[in-house]
Amino acid sequence: MDNKINHSSRAVAAAVGLLKIFNVPAVVLQVCEEALGYAKRLSKNHTNQKLWQIDVSETMFDSKIGKYRGGLELMAALGYESASATSRFLTLRGSVGASKSGLSKSVLTSVRRSIMELTQHTNGL
């Protein structure tokens, strides 16, 4: 379990670092805040299956997160991953096979830890 925690922390830190390298500070803050919004909505409404998947071609997502270098990496650090290089959807890790009653405790714990980590980075911007 500790290895998962360390990996998650490193992934968030690496994604924020990538954002900082390739974008101006205002963009970094915007992307982090938007990503936090997605993760917090998921954490609060984990039974809402619509939140388990993000359409990266959606204009709102693309304009606020997807078009910036490091944005998709940040979403991956928060638990969303692409099924393939050509997929237009990011799917929450661990959501496949989840029941309508919600995500597993381990998936929720991972998302919440990532939220805390990203919040710390965002507060430091």
Can you annotate each of these PLM segments?
Residues M1-L125:
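Ubiquitin-system adaptor modules
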